[in-house]
Amino acid sequence: MKYILIKLSIVMIFIINSASKAERIRDLTTIVGVRDNVLIGYGLVVGLDGTGDQTTQTPFTIQSLRNMLSQLGVSIPSGINMQLKNIAAVMVTAKLPPFVKIGQKIDVMVSSLGSAKSLRGGTLLITPLKGVDNQIYALAQGNILVSGFGAQSGGNTSQVNQLNGGRISEGAIIEKSIKTDFDKREIITLQLNNNDFSLAQQISDAINTYFGKKSAYPTDSRTINVILSASYDKSEKVKFIARLQNIPIIIGPSDAIIVINSRTGSVVINKEVMLNSCAVAHGELTVEIKKRTKVNQPNTILGGGSTVVTPETEILIKNQGDSLQEISSSTNLNEVISSLNSIGAKPNDLMAILESMKSAGCLNAKLEIN
């Protein structure tokens, strides 16, 4: 009897673990106050092979060049109209990581602001990067790496990927760090990646089990406050957070969600989605308009006729109505995919079908339309 109970308990544990999975707190949450800050700057790219801005169309490029040269001690008479093709005005963006120190380097993104055809082979001149407080936090400069390429000949153009944007790896040097009071805080606030009351309480319980009672408490479906344990002083906060973030959390199945992007027509379905039995018919209405010009040239013996040009328009409407298609109930992702593929609908049509199935109660999932 004892052997049977032990064997049964092992089977039950296997079933529970197969339906749930263990995640670390660091994978489910972020720490409030520990985040990136965005930086932005305006600069010039030089050294382009005739693919820069058309200076007549982008006067701010020449204005920026004049200002830069004047700061370097080079003066250009106001009457001279410079027609340059190897320079481009750009916007430079970057993310300032948390706790970064002066002298460290970060990556920057460079994007064309004017009419430049390509930034390939260009060099970004020194560009100050500012935060929302208008303070300079970094200086960017370097050669731009453009992933795309293109060719043009005889009026024909071939292009792969984007040529008007590029990246400079470690292209900016930090000149100022952001002040923070993180080391003085006695309460660490965790923020869930997704709203979930049960998960917030579950994480709080796991922290209290690990560090002791009343160490953590949730304030809402997304926020958990964690009090620095009495066994850790402020100088050991990093050790405390490291152990906190690695606490395992056994979470159950996630919500059934279908994400629809109306612009690209993409549909993403997670494994929790289930379908109930239903019948679907989806018709397609096609309207085709053809315009042509008919020329009537009279061919008479006496002459005197004139050429008549008359437009002709043909409108063709097709209504391709499909018969009802039965969809059986599906309990896993493979069955859901097979059932939806049996309809034979295109992605754009599938979005309308899923919305109708949701309204009819045949789809047990949340629809997120972007």
UniProtKB/Swiss-Prot annotation:
Disulfide topology: none
Stored InterPro entries: Flag_FlgI
Entry keyword annotation includes DNA damage: no
Pfam hit, one: FlgI
Keyword terms: Bacterial flagellum, Signal
Biological-process GO terms, alphabetical: bacterial-type flagellum-dependent cell motility
GO MF: structural molecule activity
GO cellular component: bacterial-type flagellum basal body, distal rod, P ring; outer membrane-bounded periplasmic space
Cellular localisation: Bacterial flagellum basal body
Signal peptide residue numbers: 1-21
UniProt subunit comment: The basal body constitutes a major portion of the flagellar organelle and consists of four rings (L,P,S, and M) mounted on a central rod.
UniProt xrefs under HAMAP family: FlgI
Job description of the protein: Assembles around the rod to form the L-ring and probably protects the motor/basal body from shearing forces during rotation.
Family: Belongs to the FlgI family.
Name of protein: Flagellar P-ring protein
Organism from which the protein derives: Wigglesworthia glossinidia brevipalpis
Taxonomic path: Bacteria, Pseudomonadati, Pseudomonadota, Gammaproteobacteria, Enterobacterales
Gene: flgI
